[in-house]
Amino acid sequence: MKRSCSFSFLFILLLTICIFSPLPLHAEKKGALFDAQTIYVPAYSHIYTGNRERPFLLTVTLSIRNIDPNHQIKITTVDYYETQGKLLRKYLDKPVILNPLESLRYIIPERDKSGGSGANFIVEWESDKLVNPPIVESIMIGARSGQGISFISRGEEIILSK
């Protein structure tokens, strides 16, 4: 009987914690529709290896994927910044339309280390309808002496203060 009460108490305690614990921001936004966003995307033109912090150069691919199956979106800004926040490159002269399920990519070659280990992109998009927000991420890949590395960084929506 005592063991049954202990398990019941633990079950109720666990259930209470699950019900009343706050959900992370990501869970609240899942499934939300938007008509515009500004997205910060971490990128790494190199990372450091070993005790001497030797740079390991990486190729960076910025991927922008319109995941809405029914509506196009307009990409209005794709800017590349270096570690200290200085603008290195503006990729767009005019907006680019991404049709439903269409993808777009921008490449930073492995030999271009101007961005540094703290490089990033700012991507802005808009739509005349509420749509599923695009997936915006950077993919880093590099190989040296038979060693290879690859990883991704997912973009995060930011709010620009005016």
Language-model region placement:
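Short, hydrophobic/aromatic beta-strand segments
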Residues: 71-78, 89-91, 133-137
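Bacterial N-terminal signal peptides
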Residues: 10-21
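Short, solvent-exposed loop/turn segments enriched in Ser/Thr/Gly
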Residues: 54-61, 119
